[in-house]
């Protein structure tokens, strides 16, 4: 830790942390309020969109289906109806999604506040590695959730929404169930793309070695294929 940081007392650090925390909470609240106001964009354009025929992925797959002369790829052309079986269901979901959206939208600012708090305690070399790690991790996570949202989610929604064990059983899909499934799929994509960073840190800590990875590469390929099959 740098000398000037060593001169600060515990209460001084606590006061600095308190202000960073207050700023982060205010940012989350402001973003949550904006998300609450723009509910049509949040729900219609982002959350519910993957089940609609007009969604980008669904349109592209239909065009590909026309070129290949097969209707199999043309998915989500008859979207299922979403229901809210509880009286306060839609309002509760609106509040919950607004808070989550606020946290997501404010996350860059929250990370910045966290960084400005810990950065003075790091040496220049440590700052460089930390910045690089944060940037790479953030980029991979963003790519992962984009992949999950635009590619995995439409197929998952189509498969689960149209799956039937009997023609006598009709799907009764709640809005909360739909959102939960969509969030799980998108988050899984983000976490999956973080694997290179996780493997790197495990390698640095000596938990995973190059010899270990070479020895069990075939096993890892099988596991990846199984997980990919389950997700897709």
Predicted ranges, named:
Residues 1-232:
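Membrane topogenic/interface segments and analogous intrinsically disordered interaction regions
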